[in-house]
């Protein structure tokens, strides 16, 4: 099986585990972008503890699920977004105001759309979660 997008694969694994009611999920393969995205989800209370396990083949993450995710997914293609346009993308991907987050890769790291608006920076849309 050819893995084209590691981040998309990780988000789909989380979504499937949430639907099945599991308490933890093992994400493999991983990269730094996946880790930073998981950290944003952890900061906003969508996932619990994130543990890295070095298995000699690139490693994997064991993520504790809290049952708070209704929907999660990658945004493909990865649209570039200016900070003034973030509200329009919120309306497109999130169900209502103040519900859920967009994950954005910026020049200052991977952040949520809330942090990007506060810092007045744009970036590339990676994922949505609510």
Curated annotation (Swiss-Prot):
InterPro entries: Ribosomal_uS8 (IPR000630), Ribosomal_uS8_CS (IPR047863), Ribosomal_uS8_sf (IPR035987). Keywords: Ribonucleoprotein, Ribosomal protein, RNA-binding, rRNA-binding. GO terms for biological process: translation. One of its GO terms (molecular function) is structural constituent of ribosome. This is Small ribosomal subunit protein uS8. It holds the Pfam family Ribosomal_S8. GO terms for cellular component: ribonucleoprotein complex; ribosome. PROSITE patterns: RIBOSOMAL_S8 (PS00053). One of the primary rRNA binding proteins, it binds directly to 16S rRNA central domain where it helps coordinate assembly of the platform of the 30S subunit. The keyword rRNA-binding applies. Belongs to the universal ribosomal protein uS8 family. SUPFAM superfamilies: Ribosomal protein S8. Part of the 30S ribosomal subunit. Coiled coil: none annotated. The keyword Transmembrane helix does not apply. Disulfide bonds: none annotated.
């Amino acid at each position: 099986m050819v893995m084209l997008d590691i981040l998309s694969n990780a988000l789909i694994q989380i979504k499937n585990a949430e639907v099945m009611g599991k308490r933890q999920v093992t994400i493999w393969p991983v990269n730094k972008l996946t880790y930073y995205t998981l950290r944003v989800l952890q900061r906003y209370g969508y996932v619990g503890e994130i543990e890295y396990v070095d298995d000699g083949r690139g490693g994997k993450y064991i993520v504790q699920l809290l049952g708070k995710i209704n929907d999660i997914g990658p945004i493909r293609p990865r649209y570039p977004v200016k900070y003034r346009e973030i509200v329009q993308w919120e309306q497109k991907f999130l169900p209502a105001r103040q519900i859920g987050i967009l994950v954005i890769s910026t020049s200052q790291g991977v952040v949520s759309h809330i942090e990007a608006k506060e810092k007045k920076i744009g970036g590339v849309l990676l994922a949505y979660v609510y």
